[in-house]
UniProtKB/Swiss-Prot annotation:
The BAR domain is able to sense membrane curvature upon dimerization. Membrane remodeling seems to implicate insertion of a N-terminal amphipathic helix (AH) in the membrane. Predominantly forms heterodimers with BAR domain-containing sorting nexins SNX5, SNX6 and SNX32; can self-associate to form homodimers. The heterodimers are proposed to self-assemble into helical arrays on the membrane to stabilize and expand local membrane curvature underlying endosomal tubule formation. Residues 35-45, 132-142 have a biased composition (Acidic residues). It is found in: Endosome membrane; Golgi apparatus, trans-Golgi network membrane; Early endosome membrane; Cell projection, Lamellipodium. Binds phosphatidylinositol 3-phosphate (PtdIns-(3)P) and phosphatidylinositol 3,5-bisphosphate (PtdIns-(3,5)P2) in liposome-based assays. Can bind PtdIns(3,4,5)P3 in protein:lipid overlay assays, but not in liposome-based assays. Residues 281-298 are annotated as: Membrane-binding amphipathic helix. Involved in several stages of intracellular trafficking. Interacts with membranes containing phosphatidylinositol 3-phosphate (PtdIns(3P)) or phosphatidylinositol 3,5-bisphosphate (PtdIns(3,5)P2). Acts in part as component of the retromer membrane-deforming SNX-BAR subcomplex. The SNX-BAR retromer mediates retrograde transport of cargo proteins from endosomes to the trans-Golgi network (TGN) and is involved in endosome-to-plasma membrane transport for cargo protein recycling. One of its GO terms (cellular component) is endosome. The modification N6-acetyllysine is found at residue 237. It comes from Bos taurus (Bovine). Belongs to the sorting nexin family. This is Sorting nexin-1. Disulfide bonds: none annotated. The keyword Coiled coil does not apply.
Length: 522
């Protein structure tokens, strides 16, 4: 059927007429019915609704005109050498729908295997293409490009101070001017890059990786406070988060080719990013738009025709809730591990003081060495707390934000569907208005009504194409996201287990070395 913006008329899709077809197939088309014994006219009137009628041709001539299905992805007919002409198309199973101005035409079982245009195929009984096969055929998104963020540097004093990060890029891709280059970027530049990419790609269904969240308290400490351990820890956390964010951007094939990304990596100086502050006018407008979108989403009642999207959206929502709970537990673990490290350090100091005041030489030496062991264990606890944070907590935090972006892609698809439905409703109203004008015999307004109908028919076709396109993009993006998520979690969990194993091995070595000292106490 002529839906979905294929724009092709029925005559453009019709194959040549086929001789030797049975009379009852001709009658189903709605053309003129020939005499029962008139074998010379068979096949001439099978497509009377077409723009032109071809002369009868021999079966061999027809077979030479049509593409042959040789097992490739091209559509065609299966030609068998020893098969009779009347059985030439016996294996065909797809029905060909012919659109015509006559509403009483019926579907005729086609004798050829004909592929409908993409927009029409979505509305036919033909099954959706296997995106699992598409996933296997796609090449891995591997690019010879590595980005690193180092050397956070505080520039300026007071509340006007900011931190600049060195962004280093190494690549052999020809789209860049050199193979190795470095630039200085501040945090607002990273936020500005995300805003540009999100504005261009999110509306098309792409999953744009989000930057790390702002931290007003942490940045205020850096600006007005002295360089202490808490400020250094905050800067290291932000540096690592920005590096992960930028690496996800350049790993995405669509984002990497964006000129804003290349400019961010190469250009020495960038224009100051505006609207990235939370309390700015643009920031307040974004908050208002988010609230408006949330309300409008509640009013959309989408008739989901593809169960895949419904199931995936439920999976994403459930996974986001579970990750939030797990992230809260891991943060508690990090805090307890840090508290354990502090208490172990206090314990080591107390043991050292006790050993220095002990009269028994062997006991004093054993207590002093036990204090040294506890100091080493305190370092192990501190390192493991950092591993808990950077390998687990930050990974979970990243994917909580990423899942929110995935949900936003589904919401964008829903908004595109709603726009299509609204256009269909408007088109129906325009047609009803035209009918009323015809009934009221008002020819002066009739032409304007016809023009409006043509305009809205074009909009409906375009919006349907947009919906089909964003559905394809969202499906591909979700498949790609799941592959990346599995790879990230596997790598981080393995690395985390290796740190735990190393920590326990070191702990065992410390106690094995101390055991002879304890036994030597007399």
């Amino acid at each position: 059927m002529a839906s979905g913006g294929g724009g092709c008329s029925a005559s453009e899709r019709l194959p040549p007429p086929f001789p030797g077809l049975e009379p009852e197939s001709e009658g189903a088309v709605g053309g003129s019915e020939p005499e029962a014994g008139d074998s010379d006219t068979e096949g001439e009137d099978i497509f009377t609704g077409a723009a032109a009628v071809s002369k009868p041709q021999s079966p061999k001539r027809i077979a030479s005109l049509l593409p042959i299905n040789s097992g490739s992805k091209e559509n065609g007919i299966h030609e068998e050498q020893d098969q009779e002409p009347q059985d030439l198309f016996a294996d065909a199973t797809v029905e060909l729908s012919l659109d015509s101005t006559q509403n009483n035409q019926k579907k005729v079982p086609a004798k050829t295997l004909i592929s409908l245009p993409p927009q029409e195929a979505t509305n036919s009984s033909k099954p959706q293409p296997s995106y699992e096969e598409l996933e296997e055929e796609e090449q891995e998104d591997q690019f010879d490009l590595t980005v690193g963020i180092t050397d956070p540097e505080k520039i300026g004093d007071g509340m006007n101070a900011y931190v600049a990060y060195k962004v280093t890029t190494q690549t052999s891709l020809p789209m860049f001017r050199s193979k190795h280059f470095a630039v200085k970027r501040r945090f607002s530049d990273f936020l500005g890059l995300y805003e540009k990419l999100s504005e261009k790609h999110s509306q098309n269904g792409f999953i744009v990786p989000p930057p790390p969240e702002k931290s007003l308290i942490g940045m205020t400490k850096v600006k007005v406070g002295k360089e202490d351990s808490s400020s250094a820890e905050f800067l290291e956390k932000r540096r690592a988060a920005l590096e992960r964010y930028l690496q996800r951007i350049v790993n995405h094939p669509t984002m990497l080719q964006d000129p804003d990304v290349r400019e961010f990596l190469e250009k020495e100086e960038l224009p100051r990013a505006v609207g990235t502050q939370t309390l700015s006018g643009a920031g307040l407008l974004k908050m208002f738009n988010k609230a408006t979108d949330a309300v409008s989403k509640m009013t959309i009642n989408m008739n989901e025709s593809d169960i895949w999207f419904e199931e995936k959206l439920q999976e994403v929502e459930c996974e986001e809730q579970r990750l939030r709970k797990l992230h809260a537990v891991v943060e508690t673990l990090v805090n307890h591990r840090k508290e354990l490290a502090l208490n172990t350090a206090q314990f080591a100091k107390s043991l050292a003081m006790l050993g220095s005041s002990e009269d028994n030489t062997a006991l004093s030496r054993a207590l002093s060495q036990l204090a040294e062991v506890e100091e080493k264990i305190e370092q192990l606890h501190q390192e493991q707390a950092n591993n808990d944070f950077f390998l687990l907590a930050e990974l979970l935090s990243d994917y909580i934000r990423l899942l929110a972006i995935v949900r936003a892609a589904f919401d964008q698809r829903m908004k595109t569907w709603q726009r299509w439905q609204d256009a269909q409703t408007t088109l129906q109203k325009k047609r009803e208005a035209e009918a009323r004008l015809l009934w009221a015999n008002k020819p002066d307004k009739l032409q304007q009504a016809k023009d409006e109908i043509v305009e809205w028919e074009s909009r409906v076709t375009q919006y349907e194409r947009d919906f089909e396109r964003i559905s394809t993009v969202v499906r591909k993006e979700v498949i790609r996201f799941e592959k990346e998520k599995s790879r990230d979690f596997r790598n981080h969990v393995i690395q985390y287990l290796e740190t735990l194993l190393h920590s326990q091995q070191q702990l065992a070595k410390y106690w094995e070395a101390f055991l002879p000292e304890a036994k030597a106490i007399s």
